[in-house]
């Protein structure tokens, strides 16, 4: 894949991996000299701002490539950048360091764009995966609502549903237009173009997964609830909402049994989290592993590629 590939192509790679598995039958843009200064908490939100704002906006991604966004700690300079920004795009409850910087800065409502106010959040205890009551062999319903997997909160991974990304795009267009009315037409045009690409992506997912016989996807952590809900899949996360929340021995045995019973052939890992437990499940069941990115951030190897 060429460097600087499109957002659509960048996100379609996980689509291809899902189809193969289920079977069938911290950089910023600084070209703007005097445009709005935007601090985005991590990569997906920074990318939306870049697509809408283009060269008319100065965007800072607060999460550097290779950094697990769940574990973000801000440097003093970044805290100052948040507090001096014309707009901060973030999601409350996802990155505590960003939440704290926003609160300490006493930013006005006009300076804040909280994505949690833009889209409907899923409850973390169901994680969008068990909404239809997925029954497995022997009448056992697989669930991760116990022993650390029930976080009593919401699932923050909203960006993995293209429909949510479209809503976020509209919100960014509106806020940037309020800040810089002279560029409003440009922001609107760019936002419309980006949403068209998101629509193409959604169509690709729906058509590609329509004949998928195995609807379970075993993932490193519970990042894919929105994807699963949107496309009628059942997420089976090894870890919880936080990648570091590893399963208990009983939960791991449950997942391993499920992989065997349902004939799941692929266990998905990701770039920014340890694959150790997923590798164990794959080894014990004869499944293969593949990377399914939750698109939480770029790595050093992919820093020059796009979403």
Q: Could you tell me what each predicted segment is?
A:
Residues 2-14, 20-307:
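Extracytoplasmic metal-acquisition and chelation regions
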